[in-house]
Amino acid sequence: MSLLLENLIEEDTIFFAGSISEYDDLQMVIAGAKSKFPRSMLSIFNIVPRTMSKYELELIHNENITGAMFTTMYNIRNNLGLGDDKLTIEAIENYFLDPNNEVMPLIINNTDMTAVIPKKSGRRKNKNMVIFRQGSSPILCIFETRKKINIYKENMESASTEYTPIGDNKALISKYAGINILNVYSPSTSIRLNAIYGFTNKNKLEKLSTNKELESYSSSPLQEPIRLNDFLGLLECVKKNIPLTDIPTKD
């Protein structure tokens, strides 16, 4: 199993939110397969944000964006190559806002994770899969744009035979197997880290405002795993208490 996912999910916990039913869909995955983006919980759903599109982009909003990203402290520490070094708020911010990252996928208010369908397993099928393992230290990061940014959608009636770069300093609402994700391009110049939250063993959130609080949280990992049903409840709690951007979309 990939080290990237080791502390995120159980061995059998695999979700697939990128089901490829047509060759055109395969091309769309290929169009973003080499993009550089910070890995997060969305990676376990096989969500690969695209940096190219074969559709015309339509401007739908110009506004400030607030979005969320779930991951674990192990994931960030491992990807930064920190080893046993302490993880700091500055390191977390540098990881997500590395200038090499071309795009950052964000969960927004109308991101519906109930659309996730567990991938069938030859051994068993558990609809209430583990999202964060016992012993892990998951965190919720809240990001906001530094200023108003143009938000686009793809005009699905304007397909071209060629892919073109989506471009920098813009956001694109995209759907991955029914899950709405807001992709922000050139995130290092357009967004900033606003807040970090940890998960208590009662499946509640606590704000981590200092490196001392972050270190204390990392020394008290989850005593029980967070399964899909609990995670969906946490996500709804986040939406009720944090004003995430809402971008209505038509199916």
From Swiss-Prot:
The entry's keywords: Host cytoplasm, Virion
Transmembrane segments annotated in the record for this chain: none
InterPro entries, A to Z: VP8_pox_nuc-bd
Post-translational modification: Undergoes morphogenesis-associated proteolysis which cleaves the 28 kDa to a 25-kDa product. Proteolytic cleavage of major core proteins P4a (OPG136/A10L), P4b (OPG129/A3L), and VP8 (OPG098/L4R), which occurs at a late stage of core formation, is required for production of infectious mature virions (MV).
Keyword NAD tagged: no
GO CC annotation, single: host cell cytoplasm
Single GO MF annotation: structural molecule activity
Propeptide span(s): 1-32
Residues annotated as site: Cleavage: 18-19, 32-33
Compartments reported by the entry: Virion; Host cytoplasm
Principal location listed in the UniProt entry: virion
Effect of residue 18 to A: No effect on cleavage by core protease I7
Domain of life the protein comes from: Viruses
Disulfide bridge map: none
Factors inducing expression: Expressed in the intermediate phase of the viral replicative cycle.
Function recorded in the entry: Major core structural protein.
Family stated for the protein in its record: Belongs to the orthopoxvirus OPG098 family.
Protein name, UniProt field: Core protein VP8
Lineage of producing organism: Viruses, Varidnaviria, Bamfordvirae, Nucleocytoviricota, Pokkesviricetes
